[in-house]
Amino acid sequence: MAALKGRRRTCEPGESMETESQETGSKGQAQVYLPGRGPPLREGEELVMDEEAYVLYHRAQTGAPCLSFDIVRDHLGDNRTELPLTLYLCAGTQAESSQSNRLMMLRMHNLHGTKPPPPEGSDDEEEEDDEEDEEERKPQLELAMVPHYGGINRVRVSWLGEEPVAGVWSEKGQVEVFALRRLLQVVDDPQALATFLRDEQTRMKPIFAFSGHMGEGFALDWSPRVPGRLLTGDCQKNIHLWTPTDGGSWHVDQRPFVGHTRSVEDLQWSPTEDTVFASCSADASIRIWDIRAAPSKACMLTTATAHDGDVNVINWSHREPFLLSGGDDGALKVWDLRQFKSGSPVATFKQHVAPVTSVEWHPQDSGVFAASGADNQITQWDLAVERDPEAGDAETDPGLADLPQQLLFVHQGETDLKELHWHPQCPGVLVSTALSGFTVFRTISV
């Protein structure tokens, strides 16, 4: 959440903000700041962060930016709210040269909450205590890297029993599976990490690779119900099914699922049915498939014009029969799969003013979701929210008339946002990746 520097206060969506003239000091007309819509910044103004709008906020950089990452479930427990937090990420870089790319395991720890400003009139002794406290509160990052030839388009992590693995889509047109157990071990042990970086990292290779796609791709999803079952989709409109075999390998069906006419952008397995998945494409469609049918006949349902242009991302709710989609048109759409044949979403939200790059339902709260866009916004939403008619905000401030009432929070400050994920074990914690690096935060709204 940001505010205009030099103005009285920040505001959340739907809350008015009084402005003060820099020349006269007099109060101007109350306004709502809407990112991407105005009012535009005047000369000498800039946006500043309102730390009181965040429970937690940290940033990290890893050298080359990462186009994709996934959160690795850990053994530290579920529903963790006590600070400081520890979390693990698996990410892949997009370096300037193919030889400079890395698959990485990150351990972020000692992640404290935002600290309230010191009270006015605090003495020197209190300031010294604050400096010592700041040192103890510094966030920490451990990083284990594996060389990878080619930029990494997408990373998705799954557990095969007790074995964590990462599916990796390469810009070189190959999909690989890497075992992650050793990487998880070394980021927890500084001595083991030093040994790994010195002696082991250059020797670490994928445990399986598939080069049968006709080019590069981005779509990839592990089944949440059948361990090891994987889908991969490419920019040539093809989707392939991976089936795990004995001995830790995979059989990849060479017959692609037929239906899309352009690049397959995203894939999502059903969280309730073993054989059903959804796909979206640059052909503007969303399709529902059943792998029990032959690949040429497996498409069961189609919404041909789901968005006005490319459908970039989809996410299947684990709590409701809802599919969330985001497109090049900047729209966010919620589809009730019980009514998917109608071809109409049950809700459409238009806050983003550039293509949507990532969407995800909250893992614990069925009506809450987050989205990121090429407009450098991360938005948080709640389908259950309705505007209070007695509040009268829309009448008193015309800027609220077009503001979606389900919009909870707008986060800014990143550059070229690519992907976000809710942490499945730390309620309300969001992680994003962008050209500007990683951000871990939790807002006061979720």
From Swiss-Prot:
What single Pfam family name could you report for this chain, choosing any that match? CAF1C_H4-bd
Q: Kindly indicate whether the keyword Cell membrane belongs to this entry.
A: no
Transmembrane feature ranges: none
Stored InterPro entries:
G-protein_beta_WD-40_rep, Glutamate-rich_WD_repeat, Histone-bd_RBBP4-like_N, WD40/YVTN_repeat-like_dom_sf, WD40_repeat_CS, WD40_repeat_dom_sf, WD40_rpt
List residues, modification Phosphothreonine: T10
Where does it localize? Nucleus, Nucleolus; Nucleus; Chromosome
Annotated region (Disordered) at 1-42, 110-141
Q: Which residues carry this modification: Phosphoserine?
A: S122, S344
SUPFAM superfamilies from the entry? WD40 repeat-like (SSF50978)
Biased-composition ranges, Acidic residues, are 121-135
Q: Where are the WD repeats?
A: 212-252, 259-299, 306-345, 351-391, 412-445
Question: Which Gene Ontology molecular-function terms are recorded?
Answer: chromatin binding; DNA replication origin binding; histone binding
Listed under GO biological process in this entry are: DNA replication; nucleosome assembly; nucleosome disassembly; ribosome biogenesis
One cellular component term (GO) for this entry is: nucleolus
Keyword annotations for this protein, in alphabetical order, are: Chromosome, Nucleus, Phosphoprotein, Repeat, WD repeat
- Subunit description: Interacts with METTL18. Interacts with CDT1; origin binding of GRWD1 is dependent on CDT1. Interacts with CDC6; origin binding of GRWD1 is dependent on CDC6. Binds to histone H2A-H2B and H3-H4 complexes.
Q: What does this protein do?
A: Histone binding-protein that regulates chromatin dynamics and minichromosome maintenance (MCM) loading at replication origins, possibly by promoting chromatin openness.
What is this protein's name? Glutamate-rich WD repeat-containing protein 1
Q: Which organism is it from?
A: Bos taurus
What taxonomic ancestry is recorded? Eukaryota, Metazoa, Chordata, Craniata, Vertebrata
Give the gene symbol: GRWD1
